[in-house]
């Protein structure tokens, strides 16, 4: 069977369900596909089991079980991620395996916010999930409307405590199971939820519209022409003749891109996602190295000290077999290269065990081009032992 062509006419948004175990994340995901399939034959219903038995995938050396579901509303096309286990959520959010433009926090009205609700909201704040919509689930199991109001208030307060606009964001009361069972009054609540997602979560800025950056992978000297750096453009556009900066490791230098080539052909410009070679004016081969970035002037700066939210691989995942302590000195792998750094643990934390997630303060021995939200891996001798996200730049 021929693959269906991806329809680009509708804007595309990435979302996911987060929240405490057994509050109905996967049931809600299945219910959304079922209700939307009734409106539009393009949408395929995905059963609970097909989502729950998510295949494992690798992201930055870490195995994560993630279910990818797609569907469309009248306005948009969505890619939706749902993870079977709590640890999978933590890994997914920290590694950015599936970036989210917004998240649906599922809270059971029967329980209210629970420890994992809190942890997922904190992680969403830390790793930069920008928008949250709340699905208050299992409302068919609560008779007392005052109790529902109380749970809603509690969720809003919790979100406010993590700097989300708790008073303003939508809280939609649903019964995922009722909708999955085809009960019209509950199907309607899923429609309401998707209308809230459509209107509240804005369109993400496309990678192509952001300031240009390309991590350098390789450097070549071309006789009589100068130095070419190659890599995959992370974001933005680079036009021939534009001034750029080389950032990281040493003092930032300015240069002009005098040529862009892809697959041995010359182009006028390179765009986000392209693997290109950039010819740089006035740059000797030994002035640039792998791990630096070529960037739009002023858009990114080099730093040595940052805070990061980190997931430490368990022994079973090929990680460390023993804990680490303050003063831990591994390599931090940013974009295309390893840099040694020293990690300090949060106050009151004696050690970090394999399988934990923790907030670390890191000082690198050489400056790296970074901004908030940048992902990194932690490696020992080329083996990945952790993954993280820069949550704050300190120096």
Curated annotation (Swiss-Prot):
Sequence segments annotated as region (G3): 82-85
Q: Which residues bind Mg(2+)?
A: 26
Residue segments, region G5: 175-177
Q: Where is this region: G4?
A: 137-140
Where is it mainly found? cytoplasm
Q: Which reaction does it catalyse?
A: GTP + H2O = GDP + phosphate + H(+)
Query: What Pfam families does the database record attribute to this sequence?
Result: GTP_EFTU (PF00009), GTP_EFTU_D2 (PF03144), GTP_EFTU_D3 (PF03143)
InterPro entries linked to this entry? EF-Tu_GTP-bd, EF-Tu_GTPase, EFTu-like_2, EFTU_2, G_TR_CS, P-loop_NTPase, Small_GTP-bd, T_Tr_GTP-bd_dom
Q: What is its EC number?
A: 3.6.5.3
From the Swiss-Prot or TrEMBL record, state where the protein is found.
Cytoplasm
Its function? Answer: GTP hydrolase that promotes the GTP-dependent binding of aminoacyl-tRNA to the A-site of ribosomes during protein biosynthesis.
The family this protein is said to belong to: Belongs to the TRAFAC class translation factor GTPase superfamily. Classic translation factor GTPase family. EF-Tu/EF-1A subfamily.
Q: Which protein are we looking at? A: Elongation factor Tu
Lineage runs: Bacteria, Pseudomonadati, Acidobacteriota, Terriglobia, Bryobacterales
